[in-house]
């Protein structure tokens, strides 16, 4: 499989290296970036061509798959171009920045008549996540009742905004909760330290003195699924000590924890093996005309969760997740 990697930033360059060094049955044929110098730097030692547009990449002989790793607001148009050529697509999260654009992408894929888009929620490929998923499905400890999640990051960049706690971080918990439970999320509530009128009930958490000006950090997110499973997420993006993601599953007859104490400098180190497994699964499935992980529907559903999460963050109130009817293609 000859892959065009779109975007030569941190994630794109990492995927170029991964495809070149670690993935079987795939090669990097082209790297696309509007900054040609950055694209050329990413191609060094791979034999791939550096180009400035996806149209140029498709003109490269043999290109028959696309990996999208640009900023999220650029994903939609790239997805349409790739769908028009009916090639396998691995799109980093978010699939698109909002539910409306994500639904348009779903409709475009439905019109194509088969699934071509795999969305890059890499945690599903982590060994710990897969082990916990297997235990939930086996049911040896009874039904899953609750999930307690923590998502901690060492620090944020200067341009970080409060909605990014949801859109960039809790988005992974939205996906993980859907992955573990096999259910859609129905509501989200975010509890922060805010000034509110008495009639609005918001639990006020203590704000870290190290949080950037204007951002309440950490925050607490309460999530409910279709069958009533409750999940809570501690999101703390300026924890300073490192990157740590942990999940505790509460069953009728037992408790299982993953991730606690696995502290790394960033998500890249923590989920390096998961990224490798994700891309290999995509390649293996694509060679058989299939996808090997989260679908465009999953990308749409998590976008809807994020919209509800940001609305709940602003209001402090329980907010419903609104989803369109699930197309037959994804059932």
UniProtKB/Swiss-Prot annotation:
Reactions performed catalytically: myo-inositol + NAD(+) = scyllo-inosose + NADH + H(+)
Classification via InterPro entries: Gfo-Idh-MocA_inositol_DH, Gfo/Idh/MocA-like_OxRdtase_C, Gfo/Idh/MocA-like_OxRdtase_N, GFO_IDH_MocA-like_dom, MI/DCI_dehydrogenase, NAD(P)-bd_dom_sf
Keyword Oxidoreductase found: yes
GO molecular function: inositol 2-dehydrogenase (NAD+) activity; nucleotide binding
Xref: Pfam families: GFO_IDH_MocA, GFO_IDH_MocA_C, GFO_IDH_MocA_C3
UniProt keyword annotation of Magnesium present: no
Origin superkingdom: Bacteria
GO biological process, one term: inositol catabolic process
Keyword set, alphabetical order: NAD, Oxidoreductase
EC code: 1.1.1.18
UniProt cross-references to Gene3D superfamilies, sorted A to Z: Dihydrodipicolinate Reductase, domain 2, NAD(P)-binding Rossmann-like Domain
Enzyme class, UniProt record, top EC level: oxidoreductase
Function: Involved in the oxidation of myo-inositol (MI) to 2-keto-myo-inositol (2KMI or 2-inosose).
Family listed: Belongs to the Gfo/Idh/MocA family.
HAMAP family: IolG
Subunit structure: Homotetramer.
Protein name as catalogued: Inositol 2-dehydrogenase
Organism for this UniProt entry: Renibacterium salmoninarum (strain ATCC 33209 / DSM 20767 / JCM 11484 / NBRC 15589 / NCIMB 2235)
Gene: iolG
């Amino acid at each position: 499989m000859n892959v065009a990697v779109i975007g030569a930033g941190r994630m794109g360059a990492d995927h170029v290296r991964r495809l070149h060094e670690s993935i079987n049955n795939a090669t990097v044929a082209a790297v696309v970036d509007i900054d040609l110098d950055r694209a050329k730097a990413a191609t060094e030692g791979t034999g791939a061509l550096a180009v400035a547009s996806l149209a140029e990449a498709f003109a490269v002989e043999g290109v028959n798959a696309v990996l999208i790793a640009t900023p999220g607001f650029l994903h939609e148009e790239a997805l349409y171009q790739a769908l028009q050529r009916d090639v396998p697509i691995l799109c980093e999260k978010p699939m698109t920045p909002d539910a409306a654009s994500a639904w348009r992408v779903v409709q475009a894929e439905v019109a194509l008549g088969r699934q071509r888009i795999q969305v890059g929620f890499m945690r599903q490929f982590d060994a710990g996540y897969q082990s916990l998923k297997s235990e939930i499905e086996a049911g040896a400890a009874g039904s899953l009742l609750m999930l307690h999640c923590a998502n901690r990051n060492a620090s944020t960049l200067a341009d970080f905004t409060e909605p990014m706690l949801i859109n960039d971080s809790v988005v992974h918990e939205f996906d993980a909760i859907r992955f573990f439970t096999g259910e859609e999320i129905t509501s989200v509530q975010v509890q922060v330290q805010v000034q509110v009128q008495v009639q609005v009930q918001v639990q006020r958490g203590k704000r870290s003195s190290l949080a950037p000006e204007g951002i309440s950090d950490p925050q607490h997110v309460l999530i409910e699924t279709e069958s009533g499973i409750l999940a809570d997420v501690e999101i703390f993006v300026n924890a300073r000590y490192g990157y740590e993601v942990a999940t505790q599953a509460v069953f009728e007859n037992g408790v299982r924890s993953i991730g606690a104490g696995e502290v790394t400098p960033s998500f890249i180190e923590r989920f390096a093996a998961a990224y490798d497994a994700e891309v290999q699964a995509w390649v293996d499935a694509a060679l058989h005309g299939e996808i090997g992980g989260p679908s465009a529907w999953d990308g749409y559903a998590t976008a809807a969760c994020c919209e509800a999460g940001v609305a709940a963050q602003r209001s402090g109130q329980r907010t419903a997740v609104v989803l369109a009817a699930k197309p037959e293609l994804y059932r």
